[in-house]
Amino acid sequence: MLVVLSPAKTLDVETPAPVTAFSQADLLDDSQLLINRCNQLSMQDIASLMKVSDKIAGLNVARFSQWHRPFVLNNAKQALFAFQGDVYTGLQAESLSLEAINYAQMHLRILSGLYGLLRPLDLMQAYRLEMGTKLENVRGANLYQFWGSLITQRLNKALAAQGDNLLINLASNEYFKAVKIKELNGLIITPVFKDQKNGQYKVISFYAKKARGLMTRYIIEQQVTALDKLKEFDSAGYYFVESASSATELVFYRDEM
């Protein structure tokens, strides 16, 4: 079972990670091409391209210009501990056991606009470059064209290494679009989390993101390998609903408090 997550815009690259073990991302040469392209952009270009304030654009101009290899522990941080958004609030990586972290290194991948695909212990430097950004580059008009089949090839390699063909898609649509489904040697299972509001069950973004993190933690702590075990997920009051699910979409409800 291989889990795929989105990254987060919120980062903490200052606080030391709870482990010193690290790995290097597979696609850093490709990342360097994107950094070279981003370093050609002005603050105004970035503000317009990313639809952000001048302050955030300025921060990212600085990040792009300061990005440099080699990555070591005093200039970079392991991806699992660097990302801090809603998904990662649910995951709470800092409190994972060493056994769970080692399991995650084999069974978890994080999609990234800049890095393509990250393992949990891959070092990264701070950045903001969302997968949906329409950044013209040496390979096309956007990041989907830039990454092409590279991400899917790495996912196939990870699926082959970890022993079965189940890929659990806990990423957002924006990021999972970077995966070429027809080229993937796996069965994609997409969990969906719906909260009850005014008597109806629907996806509420903030809660759904946190639930993706909770499920990721459940998978790597319990070392889940079978779908039946995945259906037993019940963190934070969620429960599996067979009648709302399909062969490739597992739906979990949570009742209104």
UniProtKB/Swiss-Prot annotation:
InterPro entries: YaaA
UniProt record, GO biological process: response to hydroperoxide
GO CC annotation terms, alphabetical: cytosol
Bilayer-spanning residue ranges: none
HAMAP family, per database record: UPF0246
Family that this chain belongs to: Belongs to the UPF0246 family.
PANTHER family xref list: PEROXIDE STRESS RESISTANCE PROTEIN YAAA, PEROXIDE STRESS RESPONSE PROTEIN YAAA
Protein name according to UniProt: UPF0246 protein Ping_3037
